[in-house]
Amino acid sequence: MRQWLLLKDILRTGWVRAGVESPESVAAHSWGMSVLAMHLCPDSLDKMRVIEMCLVHDLPEIEVGDLTPHDDTSTKSEDEHRAMARLAPQWLDLFEEYEAQETEEAKFVKYLDKLDMALMARIYEEKQGLDLSEFITSARKVIGETNLK
C-alpha cells in the first residue's frame, strides 16, 4: 500500500520538460481527473468505475515512470501491465479496461486525462507566461475544439 503513495512524488514529465515551475505530480493529475469526473460524468456511465479508473490508471508509473511521446515507448504497454500486476493486482481489470479503450467509461477517462492536461496547460500558461500550445494541440486530438476555449 505505501508504494502507491509514491505517485505523489513523481512529477509530470511533460511539464518538467516544458520548463514549468513546481509542476503537478502524477497523483495530482489523477485527483484532477477524478474531480472532473465527479462534475462531468454523464448519468449513462458508471461514475464510480470512472473515478476508480481515474485514480489507478497511472499507478504503473511508480515503477515505469511518466513516459511522454518524447521517450522510447516501444515496451510501455507491456512494462506498465507488469508493473500494475505487481503493484495492485486487485485493480488490474480497471487498468486493462482503460488501456483497451473499448468501454464508454474507459473512453471518458481518456477524455478526462486530456482535458485535465489541457486545463493545466492553460493555468501554467497564464501563471508562468509559457507557451504550452503543444499540450493543447495534443489534447484537441482526443477531446475536440469546443471543449478547450
Predicted regions and their residues:
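Active-site helical microenvironments for divalent-metal-assisted chemistry
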Residues: 1-149
